[in-house]
């Protein structure tokens, strides 16, 4: 307000100042005399009908500087007044606007509060409705669950009823099947009992026969021991006779060295008239040449008792096959030694052949057992396929597994015996080659020595050969015994079951 009063006072003073020169100018215009006609102040353009207000006259001639300044100041004063009026109007409008804004704010606040109140009420109402809806949904879910539970109960009851009916039907069928199965099993049991009775009778007969055979074996062992004792006595007598004969032959050789020329002129039949063995009695047999019996047979038969009986029969009936060559043969020792040296190739074969025969017999028995096991395996598989119950099938499967294990063990035994047989064949071939080489060397050495030396050392070398030959068969029999022991050890080392 103070600013407005100050501006009004300044405007009044400025207007009074401007009014005074305007008055003076008017007086000057009026009193001045000019030849020009005055320009109409209300018509700015001559050729147009445009008119101006008398408050703003136009002058046709140029004004002076002071007058121009006064007009400019007047124009400025008018502009200032207009601006003041506009400012006042603007202030009033601002005041009205501020009032209106305050009122509008109040109205807006009231409306906002009303809206918030209405929203709160609506939210509360909506929450109540939502809670009611949730409760209704929960009730619906509970009802649905109850319905599903009731349906499940009904289905379960129906399933139980059907299962009970099916069980009853299956039990009836099983009863009928069990009755038929029991009847078949009873029939099988009757057959098995009959077979068992037959087997027990056969076993009793076999036991009786075994007892009789054992008694016979004991008697035969006693007889064999007696024969061995008697043979030992005879062997000792034979050795004494041999020593006496060797003494006689040495004396004959010493006399023959003195009369070499006479002996050369005489026929060769008379030279060895005293060195011959006569037809000696047959009881002079060599026990080292007898076949060795070690629990298994050397002949094609598998019965040990039969083999022992055969040997004793040969001994009783004076078989020349079991006697020493020096006792039975009428050929001199020198000729026997030469013949034995020449036939050394053939003497190697019998023990190896006997071992091979025994191994082939063992292989045959093992293969027979394996074939029987394979037949049992087929029968068990058929029974497993035809078994009606699960328990019987399990028992049969257990038996089949045990049978498979035994078959594997039997196959291992067969492979071991075959390997050992191949090794023996290789060893026999190597031995034959070595003995052939040794015999060739000995024959060459004897030929060289016979070409260089006289007849006396030749007879001595033949005597040495004759001394070496009698124990050769016993050594071969010992080698056969060792081979059999190695076979037994190789078969027993795996701790396998032989019978099934």
Curated annotation (Swiss-Prot):
InterPro entries linked to this entry? Centrosomal_MT-associated (IPR051756), Cep57_CLD (IPR025913), Cep57_MT-bd_dom (IPR024957)
Phosphoserine PTM positions read: 53
- According to the record, the residues making up region (centrosome localization domain (CLD)) are 58-239
Entry function? Centrosomal protein which may be required for microtubule attachment to centrosomes. May act by forming ring-like structures around microtubules. Mediates nuclear translocation and mitogenic activity of the internalized growth factor FGF2.
Which Gene Ontology cellular component annotation is one that this UniProt entry carries? centrosome
Specify where the region named Disordered lies, as residue ranges: 1-59, 256-275, 432-478
Q: Which organism is it from?
A: Mus musculus (Mouse)
Q: What tissues contain this protein?
A: Ubiquitous (at protein level). Expressed in testis, predominantly in round spermatids. Low expression is detected in other tissues.
UniProt xrefs under Pfam families: Cep57_CLD, Cep57_MT_bd
Q: Where in the cell is it found?
A: Nucleus; Cytoplasm; Cytoplasm, Cytoskeleton, Microtubule organizing center, Centrosome
Q: How does it assemble?
A: Interacts with FGF2 and RAP80. Does not interact with FGF1 or FGF2 isoform 24 kDa. Homodimer and homooligomer. Interacts with microtubules.
What family is this protein classified in? Belongs to the translokin family.
Region entry Mediates interaction with microtubules: which residue ranges? 278-491
User: Which stretches does UniProt call biased (Polar residues)?
Assistant: 22-35
Q: Where is the composition biased (Low complexity)?
A: 1-16
Protein name, UniProt field: Centrosomal protein of 57 kDa
Q: Sorted alphabetically, which PANTHER family does this protein's record hold?
A: CENTROSOMAL PROTEIN OF 57 KDA, UNCHARACTERIZED DUF1167
Record's comment describing the protein's domains: The C-terminal region mediates the interaction with microtubules and is able to nucleate and bundles microtubules in vitro.
Mind listing the UniProt keywords for this protein, alphabetically? Coiled coil, Cytoplasm, Cytoskeleton, Microtubule, Nucleus, Phosphoprotein
Give the chief site where it resides: nucleus
């Amino acid at each position: 307000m103070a600013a407005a009063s100050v501006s009004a006072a300044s405007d009044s003073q400025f207007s009074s100042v401007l009014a005074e020169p305007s008055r003076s100018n008017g007086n000057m215009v009026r009193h001045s005399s000019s030849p020009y006609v005055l320009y109409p102040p209300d018509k700015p353009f001559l050729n147009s009908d445009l008119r101006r207000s008398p408050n703003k006259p136009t002058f046709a001639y140029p004004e002076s500087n002071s007058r121009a300044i006064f007009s400019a100041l007047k124009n400025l004063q008018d502009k200032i007044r207009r601006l003041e009026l506009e400012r006042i109007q603007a202030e009033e409008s601002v005041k009205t606007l501020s009032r209106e804004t305050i009122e509008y704010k109040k109205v807006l606040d009231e409306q906002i509060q009303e809206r918030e109140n209405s929203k709160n009420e609506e939210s509360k109402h909506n929450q109540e409705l939502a809670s009611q809806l949730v409760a209704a949904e929960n009730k619906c879910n509970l009802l649905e669950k109850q319905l599903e539970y009731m349906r499940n109960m009904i289905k379960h009851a129906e399933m139980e009823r059907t299962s009970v009916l099916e069980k009853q039907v299956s039990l009836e069928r099983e009863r009928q099947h069990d009755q038929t199965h029991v009847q078949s099993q009873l029939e099988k049991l009757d057959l098995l009992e009959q077979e068992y009775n037959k087997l027990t009778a056969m076993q009793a007969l076999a036991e009786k026969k075994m007892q009789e055979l054992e008694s016979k074996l004991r008697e035969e062992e006693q007889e064999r021991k007696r024969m061995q004792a008697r043979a030992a006595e005879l062997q000792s007598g034979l050795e004494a006779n041999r020593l006496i004969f060797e003494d006689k032959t040495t004396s004959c050789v010493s006399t023959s060295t003195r009369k070499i020329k006479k002996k050369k002129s005489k026929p060769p039949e008379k030279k060895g008239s005293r060195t011959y063995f006569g037809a000696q009695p047959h009881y002079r047999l060599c026990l080292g040449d007898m076949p060795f019996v070690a629990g298994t047979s050397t002949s094609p038969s598998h019965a040990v008792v039969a083999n022992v009986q055969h040997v004793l029969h040969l001994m009783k009936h004076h078989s020349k096959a079991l006697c020493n060559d020096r006792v039975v043969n009428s050929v001199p020792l020198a000729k026997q030694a030469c013949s034995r040296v020449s036939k050394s190739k053939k003497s190697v074969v019998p023990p190896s052949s006997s071992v091979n025969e025994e191994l082939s017999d063992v292989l045959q028995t093992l293969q027979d057992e394996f074939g029987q096991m394979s037949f049992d395996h087929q029968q068990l598989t058929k029974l497993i396929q035809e078994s009606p119950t699960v328990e019987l099938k399990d028992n049969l499967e257990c038996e089949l597994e045990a049978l498979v294990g035994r078959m594997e063990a039997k196959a291992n035994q067969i492979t071991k015996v075959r390997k050992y047989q191949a090794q023996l064949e290789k060893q026999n071939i190597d031995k034959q080659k070595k003995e052939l080489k040794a015999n060739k060397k000995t024959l060459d050495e004897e030929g060289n020595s016979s070409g260089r030396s006289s007849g006396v050392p030749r007879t001595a070398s033949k005597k040495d050969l004759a001394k070496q030959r009698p124990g050769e068969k016993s050594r071969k029999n010992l080698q056969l015994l060792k081979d059999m022991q190695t076979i037994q050890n190789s078969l027993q080392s795996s701790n396998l079951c032989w019978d099934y």
